[in-house]
């Protein structure tokens, strides 16, 4: 990424108050973009990479709705649900933060480099706890998810398998005493995109019934 990568630590006045409350809060964050939105009222929207068309649409609509109300939309810049959450926020010139599981020398996935540039152009923010040249690593992404939920007052899971990174984010939200919501689905038994969402509802998580 041809941008200046800067660093912020927990003692900085711009650091997120919400993030300071969580267990294992990162000591440092590396960032590109508008650091002033890090400590704003935020909602995280997450879900499957291999998302359904309806799931992507819901992510877009929900992000657009809350961004237009002044909330910052937080997600992970992954393809699928994350991608459309960021796009929904940008569609109303809203604030959005992308939290990566790798260093900022490269955007992952590479196909979302254009979206990352659009986030920066529109005064959004891209952050990570990993040093500049740290490559994407499967172990980094679940750990990254605590930051996504930790920045936010609420997390919304759009689509998720019963074993998934999105449910890890949801568990973090619960552990952090943050609100957690999900979408009730009539299951597509062939692809089983949303079984994790319905599992959360069975466990008592509040469903979003009107979008």
Question: Where are the regions that the model predicts?
Answer:
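Glycine-biased, small-residue-rich flexible motifs in mid-sequence functional cores and linkers
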Residues: 3-211
